[in-house]
């Protein structure tokens, strides 16, 4: 422990990371640097600064940064270019936030001369893996302190007792039993875990959802919006250009208004267990559908199918914490190359929990009406050619069947 003189802590200002802050001071006798990232969680972050100061952190060692634009531009959008979904449903809202936080912790560690970084992820979850794989990928010699794998404060009662003894300010909600769920939010989504959600037989309570109205209570009138794309990224809604963070914020508002993006999921964690989580991803759900819509007329068939084949692997890499790995970067290069001609607009219909593409157009379109039409195409497509095409593709199956018959 003696070689760790300074440590950069991913700090939210909440109970857990405040206890970790004090625990690091007590057990490592190290100078603590706090890093708090605004990635759109919707919380006031200045209380984190105030609490850090109360716990003895120097003003120069408190870093609070607005990373919303970087988060959406450099992490969310690249992921959505691949139409990324984990296990058929999950849009990876928590997973994609960890690489950015890890990156900034390492950058701050370099700038401040810290020998170690620390996080508040538990020893049961995926986040410990995501954070630490990022740390080691970006700074191979960094030391990592994961308190939940070291200390004996394994219950809320023990955490509260430690906090009271250490003089850590405790919010009333924690004294009254804590929040009803473990929640994590950023501009892409909000997640809910724990408490009665740990029983997969129990339906989530109606008042749990924060960002979306119930689809049953959504407006009776459908809403149509046009989303413009450039190189696979959304850049404008109804003709109004928006920054990356503004785009996702507005899509969240629209999706939430129409009850879009709710998900109740049992997923397979990288650490081996199954875990239930509920998610609200209104803007991301719209983006996924719209992006597939513009790709449908701009991507070559085999390129589109190759992307689909790679997507599951790409999703697992992000979910499991390998954003900074060479294989994820390699896939990203290919994905980004496919998006060069993904330009145009998509019209989507938002209605009572559903989003559907109803129109799309692009100067780069590969849709040729003269060939695709059911009417007379003037010779653009010779239907007689299909006979030879079919026979050649049936040849191997005909050979196999003839061989079977000869064998009796």
UniProtKB/Swiss-Prot annotation:
SUPFAM superfamilies registered for this protein in UniProt: Adenine nucleotide alpha hydrolases-like (SSF52402), Argininosuccinate synthetase, C-terminal domain (SSF69864)
Compartments in which it is found: Cytoplasm
Catalytic activity: L-citrulline + L-aspartate + ATP = 2-(N(omega)-L-arginino)succinate + AMP + diphosphate + H(+)
Pathway info: Amino-acid biosynthesis; L-arginine biosynthesis; L-arginine from L-ornithine and carbamoyl phosphate: step 2/3
Residues annotated to bind L-citrulline: 90, 95, 126, 130, 182, 191, 267, 279
GO BP: argininosuccinate metabolic process; L-arginine biosynthetic process; urea cycle
GO molecular function: argininosuccinate synthase activity; ATP binding
Gene3D superfamilies: Argininosuccinate synthetase, chain A, domain 2 (3.90.1260.10), HUPs (3.40.50.620), Single helix bin (1.20.5.470)
Residue positions binding ATP: 10-18, 37, 120
Keywords assigned by UniProt, alphabetized: Amino-acid biosynthesis, Arginine biosynthesis, ATP-binding, Cytoplasm, Ligase, Nucleotide-binding
Coarse class of the protein's main subcellular location: cytoplasm
Oligomeric form and interacting partners: Homotetramer.
PANTHER family linked to this entry: ARGININOSUCCINATE SYNTHASE (PTHR11587:SF2)
NCBIfam families noted in UniProt: argG, PRK00509.1
Protein name: Argininosuccinate synthase
Species the sequence originates in: Paraburkholderia phytofirmans (strain DSM 17436 / LMG 22146 / PsJN)
Gene designation: argG
């Amino acid at each position: 422990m003696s070689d760790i003189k300074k440590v950069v802590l991913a700090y939210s200002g909440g109970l857990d990371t405040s206890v970790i802050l004090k625990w690091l001071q007590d057990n490592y006798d190290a100078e603590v640097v706090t890093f708090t990232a605004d990635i759109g969680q919707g919380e006031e972050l200045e209380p984190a600064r105030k609490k850090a100061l109360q716990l003895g952190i120097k003003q120069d060692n408190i870093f609070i940064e607005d990373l919303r634009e970087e988060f959406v531009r450099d992490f969310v959008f690249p992921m959505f270019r691949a139409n990324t979904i984990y296990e058929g449903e999950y849009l990876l809202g928590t997973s994609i936030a960890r690489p950015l936080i890890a990156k900034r912790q390492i950058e701050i560690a370099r700038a401040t001369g810290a020998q170690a970084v620390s996080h508040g992820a538990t020893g049961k979850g995926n986040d410990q893996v995501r954070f630490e794989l990022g740390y080691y990928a970006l700074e191979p010699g960094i030391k990592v302190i994961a308190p939940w794998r070291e200390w004996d404060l394994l219950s809320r009662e023990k955490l509260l007792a430690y906090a009271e003894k250490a003089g850590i300010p405790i919010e009333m909600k924690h004294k009254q039993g804590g929040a009803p769920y473990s929640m994590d939010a950023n501009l892409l989504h909000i997640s809910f875990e724990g408490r009665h959600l740990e029983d997969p037989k129990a339906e989530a309570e109606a008042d749990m959802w924060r960002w979306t109205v119930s689809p049953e209570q959504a407006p009776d009138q459908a809403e149509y919006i046009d989303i413009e794309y450039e190189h696979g990224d959304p850049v404008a809604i109804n003709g109004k250009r928006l920054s990356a963070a503004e785009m996702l914020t507005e899509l969240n508002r629209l999706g939430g208004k129409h009850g879009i993006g709710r998900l109740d999921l049992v997923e397979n964690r990288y650490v081996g267990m199954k875990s239930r989580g509920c998610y609200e991803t209104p803007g991301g759900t719209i983006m996924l559908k719209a992006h597939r819509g513009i790709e449908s007329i701009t991507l070559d068939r085999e390129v589109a199918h190759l992307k689909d084949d790679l997507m599951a692997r790409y999703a697992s890499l992000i979910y499991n914490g390998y954003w900074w790995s060479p294989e994820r970067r390699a896939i990203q290069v290919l994905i980004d190359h496919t998006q060069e001609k993904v330009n145009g607009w998509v019209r989507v219909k938002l209605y009572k929990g559903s989003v559907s593409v109803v129109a799309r157009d692009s100067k780069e379109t590969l849709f040729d009406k003269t060939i695709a039409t059911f009417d007379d195409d003037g010779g653009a497509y010779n239907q007689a050619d299909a006979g030879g095409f079919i026979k050649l593709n049936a040849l191997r199956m005909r050979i196999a069947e003839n061989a079977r018959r000869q064998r009796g």
